[in-house]
């Protein structure tokens, strides 16, 4: 069904608002994907903070003008679905990669993040980015490791001199605090 001018303007405004707030964009060919597969993908997209929409490419190109994703405007050709990561940069990549495993017709065509356009093969790189919680856990581990190394060194010196357990326990308590 064809959209009238006001409906097209609403679609462009909605997509422009989403594009302005999004971290990354993946445009993927979806031809040959069944309705049940698309429904499952949309459900998972909502759960993972990904805005997923199928719109005409000309409307999408107008919507991304003035955003970081304007570099992708000339690559929007063919039947595409647009996946915008709203919460984490890698969320759309993980979604497309997961559904591409079970559906060989779903293929990423455009990958854009931070105003840069990447080859479609970079969807794997984007999908492998850690989530916010994983990144915070890695940071905490990196920050706590020097104190843990110091505690192990003090314990080793104490063990070598014969009274290491009490000294190491005291150092370990201060290192944890």
UniProtKB/Swiss-Prot annotation:
InterPro entries: Ribosomal_uL10, Ribosomal_uL10-like_sf, Ribosomal_uL10_bac, Ribosomal_uL10_bac_type. CDD domains: Ribosomal_L10. SUPFAM superfamilies: Ribosomal protein L10-like (SSF160369). One of its GO terms (biological process) is translation. Keywords: Ribonucleoprotein, Ribosomal protein, RNA-binding, rRNA-binding. GO terms for molecular function: large ribosomal subunit rRNA binding. GO terms for cellular component: ribonucleoprotein complex; ribosome. Gene3D superfamilies: 3.30.70.1730. The keyword rRNA-binding applies. It comes from the Bacteria. Belongs to the universal ribosomal protein uL10 family. Forms part of the ribosomal stalk, playing a central role in the interaction of the ribosome with GTP-bound translation factors. PANTHER family: 39S RIBOSOMAL PROTEIN L10, MITOCHONDRIAL. Part of the ribosomal stalk of the 50S ribosomal subunit. The N-terminus interacts with L11 and the large rRNA to form the base of the stalk. The C-terminus forms an elongated spine to which L12 dimers bind in a sequential fashion forming a multimeric L10(L12)X complex. HAMAP family: Ribosomal_uL10 (MF_00362). This is Large ribosomal subunit protein uL10. It comes from Xanthomonas oryzae pv. oryzae (strain KACC10331 / KXO85). The gene is rplJ.
């Amino acid at each position: 069904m064809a959209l009238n001018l006001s409906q097209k303007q609403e679609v462009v405004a909605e997509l422009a608002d989403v594009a302005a707030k999004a971290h990354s964009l993946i445009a993927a060919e979806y031809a040959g994907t069944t309705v049940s597969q698309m429904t499952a993908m949309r459900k998972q997209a909502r759960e993972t903070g990904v805005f997923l929409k199928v719109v005409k490419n000309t409307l999408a190109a107008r919507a991304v003008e003035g955003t970081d994703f304007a570099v992708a405007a000339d690559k929007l050709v063919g039947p595409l679905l647009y996946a915008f990561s709203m919460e984490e940069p890698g969320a759309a990549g993980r979604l497309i990669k997961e559904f591409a495993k079970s559906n060989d017709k779903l293929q990423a065509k455009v990958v854009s993040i931070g105003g840069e356009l990447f080859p479609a093969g970079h969807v794997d790189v984007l999908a492998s980015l850690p989530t916010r919680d994983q990144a915070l856990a890695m940071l905490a581990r990196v920050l706590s490791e020097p104190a843990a190394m110091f505690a192990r060194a003090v314990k080793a010196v104490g063990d070598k001199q014969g009274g290491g357990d009490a000294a190491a326990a005291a150092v370990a308590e201060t290192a944890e605090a």
